[in-house]
Amino acid sequence: MSYRLLSVDKDELVTSPCLKERNYLGLSDCSSVDSSTIPNVVGKSNLNFKATELRLGLPESQSPERETDFGLLSPRTPDEKLLFPLLPSKDNGSATTGHKNVVSGNKRGFADTWDEFSGVKGSVRPGGGINMMLSPKVKDVSKSIQEERSHAKGGLNNAPAAKAQVVGWPPIRSYRKNTMASSTSKNTDEVDGKPGLGVLFVKVSMDGAPYLRKVDLRTYTSYQQLSSALEKMFSCFTLGQCGLHGAQGRERMSEIKLKDLLHGSEFVLTYEDKDGDWMLVGDVPWEIFTETCQKLKIMKGSDSIGLAPGAVEKSKNKERV
């Protein structure tokens, strides 16, 4: 069966007594078209499209519609930026705004989800969830900054002394030079008329000997002690040359060796002074010799001819007289 709806004018219903309007389907007075559009209008009126509308702007910036509709957390300075723009405000006394936003279709803020997760009851302070998470970290950061500042101040007060400037080549610091100078001055100081305990090493060489020796002139006080020490140093080499003479030759060599070194019959003891000139040992007093001697050399008597007047010529003159 097919039903046909007839549109009847209301004026005709009033004027004609025969036709009466009857509601067989139990519908309301408003038309079907009007009844279908009413829920949509109500739903659209509840939705806030301006709050979710996309706009061009700087990052984390707020539009005036969002500020008026959602009521921001608290009055803030222009430099502050919201971390969660959709977080509902608790300052207006509306504790159920989060629930209303969920019912109306808006997404919940971070504070609502945090409260539900932690099970915290009652009202929450503005930005309670954020402050709850960030406040311990902020305190730790502030404490660390204060400690660093205190350490920096202490470091400035207790700054180490500046190192001495490096001078000369190879580089030697001035304090090392000072210590070396002080040590040498102490060594040169005289105590009870005796020279200091410093050392004065000089090299000793001998013609025909394949090695060198070093002697400390400060350990000797006369030419006799120096000559006997050199005899012990080079006795093996000189006695080896005289080994053909047997035991008697060795005894004779050891007996006349000192005389040979001093008088130049076979070997002559010479030294090099500060000017680089070679001189015969024994020409000057012992103190001057220790100050000017740079090297010692035991050379053959024939090679010592032409040096400054030495002990050899003086001894020859004495023998003639």
UniProtKB/Swiss-Prot annotation:
InterPro entries listed in its UniProt record: AUX/IAA_dom, AUX_IAA, PB1-like
PROSITE patterns in the cross-refs: PB1
Induction summary: By auxin.
Segments carrying motif EAR-like (transcriptional repression): 54-58
Top-level taxon of origin: Eukaryota
Pfam families: AUX_IAA
Tissue spec: Highly expressed in the whole plant.
Keywords carried by this UniProt record: Auxin signaling pathway, Nucleus, Repressor, Transcription, Transcription regulation
Cellular compartment(s): Nucleus
One GO biological process term: auxin-activated signaling pathway
The keyword Disulfide bond is annotated on this UniProt entry: no
Gene3D superfamilies the UniProt entry points to: Phosphatidylinositol 3-kinase Catalytic Subunit, Chain A, domain 1
PB1 domain ranges (all copies): 199-301
Keyword Acetylation on entry: no
GO cellular component: nucleus
UniProt note: domains: The N-terminal half of the protein contains two conserved domains I and II. Domain I includes a slightly degenerated ERF-associated amphiphilic repression (EAR) motif which seems to be involved in the activity of transcriptional repression. Domain II is required for the correct degradation of the protein through the SCF-mediated ubiquitin-proteasome pathway. Interactions between Aux/IAA proteins and auxin response factors (ARFs) occur through their C-terminal dimerization domains III and IV.
Family per record: Belongs to the Aux/IAA family.
Record note on quaternary structure: Homodimers and heterodimers. Interacts with TPL.
Physiological role: Aux/IAA proteins are short-lived transcriptional factors that function as repressors of early auxin response genes at low auxin concentrations. Repression is thought to result from the interaction with auxin response factors (ARFs), proteins that bind to the auxin-responsive promoter element (AuxRE). Formation of heterodimers with ARF proteins may alter their ability to modulate early auxin response genes expression.
Protein name: Auxin-responsive protein IAA8
Species this chain originates from: Arabidopsis thaliana
Gene: IAA8
